Every structure is written in structure tokens, then in C-alpha cells.
Amino acid sequence: HLDHVPVIDEDQKRVDYMPILERAVKAGYQSVMVDGSRLSLAENIAVTKQVADFAHANDIACEAELGSVMGHEGAGANMDYEEIFRTKKGFTDLGEAKQFAEETKCDWLSVAVGSIHGAIAEGVRNQKKPEARLDIEHIADLSKVTGIPLVLHGGSGINNQCILDGIANGIAKINVGTEIRQTYERTLGETN
């Protein structure tokens, strides 16, 4: 699976994403993910439909992202998690998710439901992520309106019961990069 091919990168620059996806298909990837979450809904739908059509023409699956998964870096590091969770700021909108799934025909949808993306920036990369939780009712509602498997990005640091409840309500794939990367980097540092 080729994950997080952005349409707009972290520096807010457009990415020529199709050649990246084409190389992945030639290399034998069985699924790809296009991240148009920094685009307007209409643009994200158009880009994702293009990528889903391309993926399906090559007999592979397409994952997409809708909503804004909070980050543990940059501006996200200074945000009040409890306030974001309470107001659902950036959470995937139910109406938009229904429209997105229907119009794009993506196979999986990465949704914003309370998780926190990993610590990548230099200033926070060795810090433990704040403990997050998932809005299980929102996950169930998203699963119902989209009718497709949901994906959880930022799965590191969420307690096991929340993960199990998320799976029971529609989460089918979970990304857990922070715990793996931090363990790898710590071990690498110990061997040098």
C-alpha cells in the first residue's frame, strides 16, 4: 500500500501526484492512497475520482482522506485537544462523507474522528503523543452513510478499547507509524 500521496504538501505546494501513483502501480503496489484533504470538497472529489478510476483500471484499491486529522506538530502541537474533540473541529462531516463516497467510488476512506497524526517535526519527534480517543458514535454514523470501510490515521497512542470499539463500528485499517518510527530511531541510536 502506497500511503499519503499528497495533492498539496505540508508547505502548501501542489504535488504532481499522478506520476508517483503510476510508478507505484508499475512497481506492483496493490493499493494507493491519495490525500486531497487540503483541497476544497469539490476539488478533493475530482482528484480522488481521477485516482480511484486509475486505480480500478489497474485492478488495485484506492484510499482517500476527508477531514482534518489533528497533528502533533506545528500548529497542531498548540491546540487544545479537548476543545477540538468537544467541538469536532476538523472532524469528517457526515454529509460530505456520503457525497464523497458516492461520487469518488474510493474503496476506503480515511476519516478524522479524534485521532492525532504522528510526531514528525524535529521538536516533537521523540515526545510521546498526547493520548487521544475516538468518537465511536461518529465512526458508526460515517460507516452507515458511506457504506465503505473506514481508515484511522494516527492510531498510535489510542487505548485498546477505543481501537476495538472503532473496529466494531466501521474502522477497517489503522495506521500506527509513530510507535514504530520512535522505536526504530531509538534502537538505531543505541547501536551507533
Per-segment meaning from a language model:
Residues 7-148, 160-176, 182-183, 187:
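Alpha/beta enzyme core
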Residues 153-156:
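Short catalytic/ligand-gating loop segments at beta-alpha or beta-beta junctions
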Residues 191-192:
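Extended, intrinsically disordered, low-complexity segments
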